[in-house]
UniProtKB/Swiss-Prot annotation:
Membrane topology value: Multi-pass membrane protein
Activity control summary: Na(+) is not transported, but it plays an essential structural role and its presence is essential for fluoride channel function.
Lineage of source species: Bacteria, Pseudomonadati, Pseudomonadota, Betaproteobacteria, Burkholderiales
Compartment(s) of residence: Cell inner membrane
Species annotation: Cupriavidus pinatubonensis (strain JMP 134 / LMG 1197) (Cupriavidus necator (strain JMP 134))
One Pfam family here: CRCB
Entry-linked NCBIfam families: crcB, PRK14196.1
Transmembrane segments: 3-23, 36-56, 68-88, 99-119
Name of the protein in its database record: Fluoride-specific ion channel FluC
InterPro entries: FluC
Keywords of this entry: Cell inner membrane, Cell membrane, Ion channel, Ion transport, Membrane, Metal-binding, Sodium, Transmembrane, Transmembrane helix, Transport
Family from the record: Belongs to the fluoride channel Fluc/FEX (TC 1.A.43) family.
Amino acid sequence: MGPLGFVAVGIGAAVGAWLRWGLSVMWNALNPALPYGTLAANLLGGYLIGLAVGFFDTHPGLPPEWRLLAITGFLGGLTTFSTFSSEALANLISGDYGWALLHLLSHLGGSLLFAALGLWTYRLLA
């Protein structure tokens, strides 16, 4: 990867992280047991990765820096497995097993579902 790839990943990651932080600031306090901002970031990221995979698979001639910017950078910064894991662990430690299970299913199942919906949307529109 050349210097432009590093710049693309860095810019994308910064923008994705800022969006994730903004969603957390706006919505996490509404339900600390299932922080909606983190969930929104992961579901949105899942949907957008589906769109991006569909787009980049049908546009193989694009410079690789665009994929690095969008997928590795932006979506890597937006989605947050480490935050998701710490929130699930907090539920488990406090004995909130039902919330922990809902948290796990919402993020994992929801992200997979939204990724499939994103790919389906792209294929429908392409």
